[in-house]
Amino acid sequence: VQLSFPTQEPGLVSTFVCHCADCRKITASMFASNFSVLDTHLTHIRGQDNLTAFAQSKTIASGKMMTNYFCKTCGTLMYRVGERFPQVKIMRIGTVDDFNLHETKLRPRREIYVKDRCGWVSAVEGAEQYEAQRPKL
């Protein structure tokens, strides 16, 4: 699967770290490093037919459905779509091949669900901190 996405507004909505229970579960880690883009700005270059979806609401704080799209070949979580914000795709920073973007345009600007942040994980320097979900991704 190969995607093309924006690295600035208006298509790039946000870059953030999430400490919620669902992100911990889906990443098998203590947090998820994410960025969100508008559907209208995300392009599937190839492999869209190689995606499989899994949806659930059990571990989502809002109780709303979250659909996860995985690569059938390697199992990588390519993006997520939430029922609360269906026009936005939530992507994982770690899926981006250009490591320079991790430190620049995709560097997390916000942290959400910091009330659930593990005690041995430090805040992202300079990132806005939110106890729970920020109103806008």
Identify what each model region corresponds to.
Residues 2-137:
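A short Gly-Trp-Pro
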